[in-house]
C-alpha cells in the first residue's frame, strides 16, 4: 500500500529562529514512524505541541512560482518571501550546485534562479519535502524575494483530493525496466570473454568487414554492425547489446552476472526507465482531463496517454496497470504519479472502482447501447412499479406495455422509447460473457429467448456446447458460442463450391452440409487466445514458432518451410487468434457440428515448393537442402559459445543467387529484407560449397540441380 509522505513548511525570522512549523499530511495526525517525525524531534528540536498539523498537500508537479503562491496563502503572508531548503536547492542555486541559503550569501559564485517544477528541482520531494521560508526583508538578499498569488485551481484541486483521499485504493505493485546506455572499456577482448562465460542465454558475437564475417555464440544471426555483442532474455527480448564503444543494458542483473571482472569502466551516456505499475483496483483507461488540472498532467491526442507538465514523463493507462516512462531517475516519482492518476481517474470518471456499472445512478453505458437521433436504447431509472405489473422472476416485472428489471442494488430500469420501437429489455451479452454482469439495454425485438436474458432473469446457465445459429459478420471477436463469416475474399475462396441456407430476413443458419466459418479458439486452441498479435513482428514470430498458417488483413502468412505447413488455418480478428472450421447443420435439428479442416487449401499458394535434396552424407551425418541430420534426426541443438565460425562476406548487388531466388523473395515478410536475403545467400553458399570465385554460370548450374523452382 503506497503511503503519501508528509511534508514540512518551516518559517524563520531574521535570526533564523523558527517561528512556525507546519506538518502537511493527507492522513490524521503525525506519523511517528515517519522520517519527518524523526527530523522534527532530533534536528529541529521543536516540541510537538508547537507543530501545526494541517490536512494539506503541496502538489509536486507545481512550478516553483506556483509553490510560492501556495505557501504565501498557507502562511497568510502578503509580502515578498524566499523559499529554500537545508539539503536541496529550490528557488535559487549556485552554478557549482552548492546549496543556497539566503542568510549566508556569497558574491563570489554565480546565482541561478529556477523556473522549473518542484519534483525536478527537489529530487527527493516524493520522500522527504522540507521547505524553509523567510521573509525577503529579513535576509541579506531581499532583492531576491517575490510575492506570488495562489492559483485558485490548485486550491480547488487540493480540496477535492483531501475530500476523496480516504476512498482511494493505493494498493499497487511496481516493476521497473532500465534502458541504460554506457560508454565502456569493454572492447573486442572483453566482449569475447562475456561470450565464453555464457552458459544458457542466447548470445551472438559478430565481427565483420568487407571480406569476412566472424561469428561466435549460440544464436547465429547476421546484423549490420561491424562489431556487435547481443544477448537475449528468455522471453526473446534484447537484454544486452554492445558495439565495443558503448553498451546498452536492458537487464541490469544479467549484466552484473556476466561481466568478466570488476575492472569494467562504465560511464553513463543516457538512460530511461519504464515502470509498470500493477493496480489492485481497475481504473478507466480513457481519461478526459479538466482544464483546471493543467498543472498536473498534459493531455495528448490519445486519451489513454498523459504527459507530465514538463513533457519528459509519459504515462500510458490501461484497465489494470499503468506504464510510466521517465528520462532520469527521480526517487519514487512513479508511485507519486500513480497516486495522482488514481485520484484523477476517480475524480473525472463516473465508472469507478466497482465493475458493476449499475451500482451508479448516473450510468455510462457501453457504446453498443446508446441513444441516437432515431433510437432510444438506453434504459431509464424509475422509482416504483406500476400496479398492473406481473412478477416474471425475482428481478423482472412485466405489463402489456412495459418491462422492468431490478438489479442487485434494487435500482429499477425500464425502456421508454417515445417511438414505441425499443421497449424490450435485454442485456449486453459481451459484458455477461466476460464479467457475468447483467447490464440492461433496450431492444427492437423481445429478448426473452436469448441466453443472456435466461441467465440474468431466470438464473439459467446455457449449455456451452450449444452454438448460436446467428452468423456474425467478419470483424467481431467470436465468443465460444458464436460463429462468424470469413472476409469476402476468403469466403469466396473457401466456400465457392459449398452451399448454405439462411433464414430470409436475417443471417440465422438453417442448414448446410459443410461451410467454412470462423470459430473461437477457446475450444481447440485456447493457448492461442492468450496471445495478442499486434505487429508484423508478432505475426512472423507466431507463424514460425507455431508452424501455422495465419490470415491477417487479407494476407496469408506461412511458416518458412513448406514441410511445416499442416491442415490447420487460423485468422486474426482484432488482434485475437481464431480458427477456421467447417460448420454442419441439418434443417430439422438445432445442433451445429464442427469438423476440423482435412486439407489446407491455402497450401497450394505457398511460393517456395522444392523437394528436399541430399547434398552430402557420411558416417550418419547428412546435409540436405532442408537442414542437417544426425542419424536421421534433424540437428537442432544450440551451437557452442566457445567456437568461432569464419565465412566470406558477400554483397547482394548483382548477386547470381539473389537473381535466382528473386521470385521467392518478393513474397517474404520481414522487418529487414536486405538482411534476410544476405542470410539466405550465405546459407546457400555454405550448404552447397559455393565460393566467391565461382562464375554466374557455375552458380546457376548448381542451384538448378538442388533447387528446382
UniProtKB/Swiss-Prot annotation:
Q: Which Pfam families does this one have? A: Pox_VERT_large
**Chief location category:** virion
**GO process terms (BP):** positive regulation of DNA-templated transcription
Q: Which GO terms describe its molecular function?
A: DNA binding
> What cystine linkages occur within this chain?
none
Q: Return the GO cellular component terms, semicolon-separated.
A: virion component
Q: Which UniProt keywords apply?
A: Activator, DNA-binding, Transcription, Transcription regulation, Virion
Question: What is the superkingdom listed in this entry's lineage?
Answer: Viruses
InterPro entries of this UniProt entry?
Poxvirus_early-TF_lsu
Q: Where in the cell is it found?
A: Virion
User: How would you summarize the oligomeric state and partners of this protein?
Assistant: Heterodimer of a 70 kDa and a 82 kDa subunit. Part of the early transcription complex composed of ETF, RAP94, and the DNA-directed RNA polymerase.
What the record says about family reads: Belongs to the poxviridae VETF large subunit family.
Function comment: Acts with RNA polymerase to initiate transcription from early gene promoters. Is recruited by the RPO-associated protein of 94 kDa (RAP94) to form the early transcription complex, which also contains the core RNA polymerase. ETF heterodimer binds to early gene promoters.
Record-given protein name: Early transcription factor 82 kDa subunit
Taxonomic source organism? Fowlpox virus (strain NVSL) (FPV)
Amino acid at each position: 500500500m503506497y503511503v503519501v509522505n508528509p511534508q514540512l513548511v518551516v518559517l524563520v525570522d531574521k535570526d533564523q529562529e523558527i517561528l512556525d512549523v507546519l506538518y502537511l499530511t493527507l492522513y490524521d495526525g503525525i506519523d511517528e514512524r515517519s522520517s519527518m517525525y524523526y527530523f522534527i524531534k532530533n534536528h529541529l528540536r521543536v516540541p510537538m505541541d508547537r507543530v501545526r498539523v494541517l490536512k494539506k498537500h503541496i502538489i509536486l508537479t507545481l512550478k516553483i512560482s506556483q509553490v510560492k503562491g501556495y505557501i504565501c496563502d498557507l502562511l497568510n503572508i502578503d509580502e515578498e518571501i524566499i523559499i529554500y531548503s537545508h539539503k536541496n536547492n529550490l528557488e535559487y542555486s549556485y552554478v557549482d550546485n552548492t546549496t543556497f541559503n539566503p542568510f549566508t550569501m556569497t558574491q563570489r559564485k554565480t546565482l541561478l534562479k529556477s523556473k522549473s517544477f518542484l519534483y525536478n528541482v527537489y529530487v527527493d520531494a516524493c520522500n522527504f519535502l522540507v521547505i524553509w521560508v523567510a521573509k525577503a526583508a529579513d535576509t541579506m538578499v531581499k532583492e531576491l524575494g517575490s510575492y506570488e498569488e495562489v492559483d485558485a485551481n490548485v486550491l480547488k484541486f487540493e480540496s477535492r483530493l483531501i475530500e476523496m483521499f480516504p476512498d482511494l485504493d493505493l494498493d499497487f505493485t511496481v516493476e521497473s525496466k532500465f534502458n541504460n546506455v554506457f560508454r565502456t572499456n569493454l572492447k573486442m577482448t572483453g566482449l569475447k570473454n562475456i561470450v565464453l562465460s555464457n552458459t544458457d542465454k542466447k548470445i551472438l558475437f559478430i565481427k565483420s568487414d568487407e571480406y569476412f564475417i566472424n561469428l561466435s555464440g549460440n544464436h547465429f544471426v547476421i546484423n549490420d554492425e561491424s562489431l556487435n555483442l547481443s544477448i537475449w532474455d528468455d522471453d526473446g527480448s534484447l537484454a544486452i547489446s554492445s558495439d565495443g564503444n558503448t553498451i546498452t543494458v536492458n537487464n541490469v542483473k544479467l549484466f552484473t552476472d556476466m561481466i568478466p571482472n570488476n575492472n569494467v569502466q562504465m560511464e553513463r551516456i543516457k538512460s530511461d526507465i519504464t515502470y509498470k505499475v500493477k493496480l489492485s483496483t481497475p481504473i478507466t483507461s480513457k481519461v478526459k482531463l479538466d482544464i483546471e488540472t493543467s498543472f498536473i498532467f498534459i493531455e495528448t491526442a490519445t486519451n489513454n496517454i498523459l504527459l507530465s507538465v514538463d513533457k519528459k514523463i509519459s504515462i500510458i493507462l490501461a484497465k489494470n496497470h499503468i506504464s510510466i516512462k521517465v528520462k532520469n531517475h527521480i526517487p519514487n516519482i512513479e508511485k507519486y504519479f500513480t497516486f495522482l492518476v488514481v485520484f484523477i481517474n476517480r475524480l473525472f470518471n463516473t465508472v469507478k472502482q466497482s465493475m458493476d456499472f449499475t451500482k451508479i445512478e448516473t450510468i455510462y453505458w457501453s457504446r453498443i447501447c446508446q441513444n441516437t437521433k432515431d433510437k432510444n436504447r438506453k434504459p431509464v431509472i424509475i422509482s416504483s412499479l406500476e400496479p398492473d405489473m406481473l412478477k416474471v422472476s425475482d428481478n423482472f416485472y412485466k405489463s402489456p406495455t412495459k418491462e422492468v428489471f431490478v438489479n442487485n442494488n434494487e435500482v429499477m430500469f425500464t425502456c421508454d422509447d417515445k417511438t414505441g420501437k425499443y421497449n424490450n429489455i435485454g442485456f449486453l451479452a459481451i459484458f455477461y460473457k466476460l464479467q457475468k454482469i447483467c447490464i440492461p439495454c433496450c431492444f427492437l425485438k423481445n429478448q426473452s429467448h436469448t441466453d443472456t436474458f435466461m441467465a440474468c432473469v431466470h438464473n439459467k446457465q446455457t449449455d456451452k456446447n450449444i452454438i448460436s445459429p446467428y452468423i456474425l459478420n467478419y470483424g467481431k471477436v467470436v465468443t465460444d458460442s458464436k460463429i462468424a463469416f470469413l472476409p469476402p475474399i476468403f469466403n469466396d475462396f473457401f466456400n465457392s463450391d459449398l452451399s448454405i441456407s439462411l433464414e430470409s430476413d436475417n443471417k440465422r443458419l438453417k442448414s448446410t452440409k459443410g461451410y467454412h466459418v470462423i470459430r473461437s479458439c477457446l475450444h481447440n486452441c485456447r493457448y492461442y487466445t492468450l496471445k495478442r498479435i499486434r505487429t508484423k513482428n508478432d505475426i512472423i514470430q507466431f507463424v514460425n514458432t507455431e508452424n501455422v498458417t495465419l490470415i491477417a488483413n487479407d494476407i496469408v502468412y506461412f511458416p518458412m518451410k513448406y514441410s511445416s505447413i499442416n491442415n490447420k488455418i487460423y485468422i486474426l480478428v482484432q488482434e485475437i487468434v481464431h480458427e477456421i472450421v467447417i460448420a454442419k447443420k441439418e434443417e430439422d435439428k438445432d445442433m451445429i457440428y464442427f469438423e476440423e479442416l482435412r486439407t489446407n487449401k491455402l497450401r497450394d499458394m505457398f511460393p517456395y515448393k522444392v523437394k528436399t535434396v541430399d547434398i552430402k552424407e557420411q558416417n550418419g551425418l547428412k546435409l540436405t537442402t532442408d537442414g542437417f541430420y544426425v542419424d536421421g534426426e534433424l540437428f537442432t541443438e544450440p551451437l557452442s559459445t566457445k567456437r568461432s565460425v569464419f565465412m566470406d562476406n558477400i554483397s547482394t548487388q548483382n548477386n547470381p543467387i539473389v537473381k535466382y531466388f528473386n521470385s521467392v523473395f518478393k513474397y517474404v515478410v520481414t522487418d529487414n529484407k536486405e538482411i534476410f536475403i544476405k542470410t539466405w545467400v550465405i546459407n546457400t553458399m555454405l550448404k552447397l560449397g559455393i565460393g566467391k570465385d565461382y562464375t554466374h554460370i557455375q552458380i546457376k548450374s548448381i542451384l538448378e540441380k538442388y533447387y528446382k523452382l
